[in-house]
């Protein structure tokens, strides 16, 4: 979606987008391709796209807080978050609503000022509580 195409959005959605201060993202299937890769030794791999990293960098440059909520726990996610300067991270959150409440509180904003991007059933309760979701 280009910036010029934002003109075609309904005014209430544009208003909610203008109020976003916190962008929260699921990891598997949103920042990765959703696959789980295991080496013979048991090491787990995840494939992150550099374009998503660039988007997170730009969101932070624009003044948005960015955070991650994921149902799995992985050193790889910790490393990627550190590389991107993302400090608002909750891993192992099978119930993501408490994680949402914690991160919103830490960011000093409200759920109405939060956008969330998810891709699975576990994300639906969070998506129902934030100002903007996809």
Where are these regions (language model features)?
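Asp-based phosphoryl-transfer active-site loop
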Residues: 17-35, 127
